[in-house]
Amino acid sequence: ITRQLIESLKAIMVENKTMGVPFGRMVFRKGTPEFKATANKMALINLAQKGAVVSKNETVTAKRVDKGFVVQTRRGEFACDHDTFFGLFEPDKTVVDAGYWEEIYPPIERMYPKEIGRLKTKAAQLGIDQWLTWDYQIEDLCELAFKPHGAICGWQMALGKSRLAISLALLLNGKSLIVLKSRLVSEMVNELNLLGITDFKVVKSKADTEHLGKVNIVSYERLKRAIDPRTPKLTLAKFLRKKIKNVLCDEGGLLANHFSQQSRALWCLGAKRKYILDGTPCPNYPREMQNLAAFVAGQERFYQPYSMNGGFIEKRLFNSAEFQPTGRDEFTRRYVTLEWATNEFLNSHERGAKREVPKIKQAFLQDYRAWVAPIIKRRVQQEPAVSRYVTFPIPTLCDPINVDWEIDHLLLYVKTAEEFANWYRQHAKQRGEEGKGLSLTMILARLEACFKAANVPSTVSGYGKGFQSLTSKEIACINLIKQEIDKGLRPIVFAKNPVVLRRLSAELNKMNISNLVFTGEDTIAKRTEKLNQRIRNGSDQVMLASFGVTQDGLNLPMLNSVILFNRSFKSRAEFQAIYRLIRPQQKSEVSCYFLHLKGSIDEYMGQLIKWKTLANEAGLDYGEQSDKEDFVHFDAFVYRFLNSIPELKERIDALKKLAA
């Protein structure tokens, strides 16, 4: 064994040790650390422990631990998992509404004081402490820089990710590239100028790659774009390959889609250190963390044993590699709740059909949390380290407002639904005879017609002629806007389709309610100018915005009420929309309203978002998943939807008789 090999092995051991160190973490726990509870029935607390039985109405003492609770009964002390505990016991009423913050992992500085100390000294020499003035910002900066390959910065919105990205780019050795959405490039340049940083370059062309600065900025759109139309595969990312040591991806959750052009461009850079900065890193499902972890931490490693296309690393491989699972298969077995899936989906987690419950398997929930602990540095707005310096309002998510149908709208919806129903039954029968599963892509494409019939009926082809009057949902939205304005608030309405927003705007104009329609139909520069003039520095009473243009980098604390005209299939879209208003400058309590047409697709989408949000919170923020509710799958919803058509027809006939 040569000296060179020994040193290489030592370096690998140090890398594994430092990459495997969990980031410092505080989490919010419901209840209190220790409390009294009463048994609902006589039952076994733990099948693996002798004597772990409790009598009905027996009072016990419960102490919270990582895997659930330690329960002190008359017969001794026994371990009890979270779901079993709440199925057997009723906590004291005083405990239900209580909560506390708990340190799950200590700051890395406690284990590596010299290394973190050196990084803090370097940051001070660079003057970074002059603009990262809050303790948690410097602490997190040094913890992120401590990781030799990279990490995910999961700071929630408005905690200072832009300045953190600049600071990290300066602190790390070598040239750094900050990649962001095109509409945010000018804001990042303004921030650099404000901080007095001159050694930076905005990369727009091949020529710019020849003379790079310490900090370099490029948009995702330019990075993936071909230099010359004649060579479509020769992108700007390929010219930057190996010229950049560190890459920082703002709103890098888009890497969850490994097949997108943006993701391919980022992987192409070949940077030594890779960072993702995103307040909602998983756009939809907790499983999307696998692709993000592979990008920042590598694959098939001791600290990140999963892989996207390779194997799964475990200790038993020292003895035998027989029956070694792939990284995807093992990740799916542990964390993904599937009832069935095609091989295409199992191989990629992105393409192909499946029936999935948005939930991390309860048996592996603690394992998932331990896996992400060294990969993501998480901060939320309400935790003590943040609230020492700044406070954020907690948005109130109101129960959905169920809206009754207007007769003509209901007739249109039923016609569209029947067309979908006939196609669906025929498609299901045909695929069954062929021994194939249903085509999810085709179903979603057809179902889009039902979405439009419910939310944008004037655009439905074949039936839209003459149906230009306001729907009951649009009337409910306008009434809600007026109600909020009467309270002295400035609401923002989110919708998927700009047609809806223009219809609402026309009606508000008749009422002399000033409003701004903010959609992708205008250029970035034009709509930003309107936003500044009429909302930020103006007095327009209402903002009508499409989901697509308000996802990130938009601060709207001057608005203070949220109305979602329709739901989104992506939890990130709704979360980002709501949190545009949640800023330190927000002076009002923010309420969020959701409009649902009774029995329509709105109800399924609302359920889907709820489950996705709870699953992501359970994995990242130690939230609690509930087993008390059953998830209504897409096909079950479809059949319930189809079976409701005769009832809808009866309602139409009854309404017609009343009208006569």
Task: Tell where the protein language model's regions lie, with residue ranges.
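Conserved Walker A/P-loop ATP-binding site and its immediately adjacent core
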Residues: 164, 173-196, 287, 496-498
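Conserved RecA-like ASCE ATPase "motif II neighborhood" in helicase/translocase motors
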Residues: 218-246, 254-265, 545-548
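Charged, low-complexity
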Residues: 1-151, 214-223, 233-234, 242-245, ...
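Conserved Helicase C-terminal RecA-like lobe
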Residues: 130, 164-174, 386-417, 429-543, ...
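Inter-lobe coupling linker of SF2 helicases/translocases
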Residues: 217-218, 222, 237, 256, ...
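Walker A/P-loop
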Residues: 148-168
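Conserved RecA-like P-loop NTPase helicase motor core
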Residues: 256, 514-608, 612
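A conserved SF2-helicase RecA2
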Residues: 569-575, 582-659
